[in-house]
A protein has these predicted regions:
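Short, high-confidence coil segments that cap the C-terminus of an alpha-helix
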Residues: 145-147, 342
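Short, conserved alpha-helix that lines the donor NDP-sugar binding/gating region
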Residues: 134, 138
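Conserved "HGTGT" condensation-loop signature of ketosynthase/thiolase-family condensing enzymes
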Residues: 1-118, 158, 167, 171-187, ...
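Hydrophobic pocket-lining residues that define ligand/cofactor binding sites across diverse proteins
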Residues: 140-141, 312
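Short conserved active-site loop signatures built around small residues
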Residues: 130
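Amphipathic alpha-helical interface segments
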Residues: 126
């Protein structure tokens, strides 16, 4: 069976530091780092109806950008990825309702609200949720089972998430500085983003998806193996599925949470995969978004792809300038960065509980 290509025809993102601007991630660089990058002063997340207004701010501009008709939307399947879903709308004191809330509540509401195809999917695999949503959507498009996919990542503030990460001593009291020797943990963030995937490129197309892989590491209930072996295997599987070699990678979008174990595992995997001690050419450079957006957990897959697509359209790249010393973990991947010839990009996502995913995209410039 001949598989169809999968293209990212448009994307839109609303990340808390953007202050309701759905354009460029460059805006986030100007914001000072805060303990929690939050929407809470703008929209009340404790009300489900208010939560839906986030999606309006992202999806209506996306639909307009692609000039999608009601008929187009009816042929579009929804793939939603999130860690906490609508837990923020469960009122304090209603703990029993927390466990009765349906996991597809948001996806059903969105499908009805925008007239999408009635077949919708929800993914909640920790920090890989929306990355897995993107992976599965692309597979259904490539095999001809669906025509179009609207892939959404969303994450909203809720006390359960904050207290959970605090109890594990994973939250930084200062800032998120991934891979730095002095890193002290993550900063949580909120955001909503959407990708529109199809088998045919449009004038707005920015990326072509080459492949991806996802797998669960049984090493621990909370984290992946720190030697990076499972992460390296997932990336290898991703490259195999995309039919490319590690030497074809021009840029790596790192997961980069700034937690001690996660950064170490990712660094070990990439160092092994790109064999930095033996290769004669410099390994591919890295790019990280969490220092600017915070860690948006299950939404980070789609948010970071959308932000990269935005950077690509503006020819703006964000070097990890916080990696300044040769004893920082990813130093070999920082030296000699050159973003001018980026073509093939590896996106890494590694989740709580050991669910790991990797995706490969090719920059699309109107020709194959």
């Amino acid at each position: 069976m001949n598989k169809r290509d999968v293209y990212l025809n448009a994307s839109e993102v609303l990340s808390a530091p953007l202050s309701n601007k759905t354009s460029s991630v460059v805006s986030t660089i100007e914001d000072e780092s805060v303990a929690f990058k939050s929407f809470r002063e703008e929209i009340n997340c404790s009300d489900f109806t208010s939560i839906l207004s986030y999606f309006d701010a992202v999806l209506y501009p996306l639909f307009k950008k692609l000039n999608l008709s009601a008929s187009d939307l009816a042929k579009t399947n929804l793939f939603l990825g999130s860690t906490s879903l609508d837990i923020s709308a469960v009122k304090v004191g209603d703990e029993d309702k927390l466990w009765l809330s349906k996991t597809d509540k948001i996806s059903q509401a969105l499908a009805k609200r925008y007239g999408l195809n009635e077949l919708e999917f929800t993914f909640s695999t920790a920090c890989t949720a929306s990355a897995n949503a993107c992976l599965y959507a692309s597979r259904l498009i490539s095999t001809g089972k669906i025509e179009h996919a609207l892939v959404i990542g969303c994450e909203f503030y809720n006390p359960l998430t904050v207290e959970g990460f605090k109890s594990l001593d994973l939250i930084s009291k200062t800032e998120l500085i991934a891979f730095a020797k002095g890193r002290s943990g993550l900063i949580l963030g909120e955001g909503v983003a959407a990708l529109y995937l199809s088998s045919t490129p449009t004038a707005q197309c920015s990326l072509k998806m080459l492949g991806g892989a996802s797998s669960c590491d049984t090493y621990s209930l909370t984290m992946t193996q720190e030697d990076g072996s499972h992460i390296a295997q997932v990336i290898n599987d991703c490259l195999l599925q995309a039919n490319i070699q590690s030497t074809d990678i021009d840029l790596i979008k790192v997961h980069g949470t700034a937690t001690l174990g996660n950064d170490e595992a990712e660094c070990n995997a990439l160092t092994t995969l790109f064999n930095t001690s033996e290769i004669t050419q410099s390994p591919p450079p890295i790019i990280a978004f969490k220092p600017f957006t915070g860690h948006t957990l299950g939404a980070c897959g789609v948010i970071e792809i959308a932000l990269f697509a935005d950077c690509l359209s503006k020819e703006s790249y964000i070097p990890p300038e916080y990696i300044t010393q040769n004893n920082d973990l990813m130093w070999p991947f920082y030296k000699g960065n050159d973003f001018s010839q980026v073509n093939t990009v590896l996106f890494n996502y590694f989740g709580f509980g050991g669910n790991n995913a990797a995706l490969v995209f090719q920059c699309y410039r109107g020709t194959e």
